[in-house]
């Protein structure tokens, strides 16, 4: 594989995470405007975003098989057509059913693209380089989370319709579409060259279960928290711009944290530092929820920084539970994380309707506490120390 081809594939991976991050994170910023557009209460409107998350979940789950049947390049190009149709549906359709269908299609496109992005990184890089590249790739999720809420706030403050936010997100997929030209993708399934060596199957162990629960609770907690921060902040009397700034501050700090931890993690045992980070994140989230308005920006900045490496560390630890990194194992943990994404508004919507945004934030805080417990319990059963020792690529 040529170096320019590797760079193109790596950038497709980066942008695939940016696309998913933009779609998922911008929800909290535009939810109120979309609710007004359809004359619905915000708590009811949040349920329709479950279609976006369901699309992401279904596509990540199915793409473990689809990648072996349909070439990756074909999937990405077809995804671009679906993206254009979905954004057009949001712009020109005025029914809630069409909105829900468009959100589902956006979720499908996003999930397929993200699963391809994750696969490409695990194929292109090995050993420690894989972990740091995954962390850097994941930072594009948070980079989009920093940029697109600011774009949304800018557009909405000027009374520009909410659907233009999704048109802007579509530009990310346009970049992916352009990168597919003159680019060779790894072949899979019937298109791949098969080696004669027999594949040795390994048992995953109970540590994978702990990591799967941690992944689900972490993503559900994180998105449950950040999706309702704008509504919570507005309830405290903050302006739309200030509420958007809190979300952007979180993702900016999250992004810088990922870059920092891609170096820091090399010097620590991954399970131990993951436990410390999960504990710190739970405490910082509690301080944000119970603290004064003046301290909120500082708490959300530190929360973003110290929670940034948690999810990627969970995935990396999962890949180290077997001697040979298993794509199905990594996909299983990714799927559990995506279930957390899908459940975000299923769980928090009724809580907000019944008890308000602060109750949703406290629920998210409880989920972070579960992540800490899972990471602590993992220390007694994890196989990563015996499997990661020889990996010095």
From Swiss-Prot:
Highest rank taxon of the organism: Bacteria
Classification via SUPFAM superfamilies: MFS general substrate transporter (SSF103473)
Recorded topology in the membrane: Multi-pass membrane protein
Record-level GO cellular component terms: plasma membrane
NCBIfam families found in the cross-reference section: PRK03699.1
UniProt subcellular location: Cell inner membrane
Alphabetized Pfam families for the sequence: MFS_1 (PF07690)
InterPro entries recorded: MFS, MFS_dom, MFS_trans_sf, MFS_TsgA, MFS_TsgA-like
Cytoplasmic side: 1-10, 72-77, 122-133, 183-205, 266-272, 319-331, 382-393
Molecular function GO terms recorded: transmembrane transporter activity
Periplasmic side: 32-50, 99-100, 155-161, 227-244, 294-297, 353-360
Keywords: Cell inner membrane, Cell membrane, Membrane, Transmembrane, Transmembrane helix
Protein family per UniProt: Belongs to the major facilitator superfamily. TsgA family.
Name this protein carries in UniProt: Protein TsgA
Lineage of the species this protein comes from: Bacteria, Pseudomonadati, Pseudomonadota, Gammaproteobacteria, Enterobacterales
Keyword Plastid: no
Entry's transmembrane regions: 11-31, 51-71, 78-98, 101-121, 134-154, 162-182, 206-226, 245-265, 273-293, 298-318, 332-352, 361-381
Organism: Salmonella typhimurium (strain LT2 / SGSC1412 / ATCC 700720)
PROSITE patterns for this protein: MFS
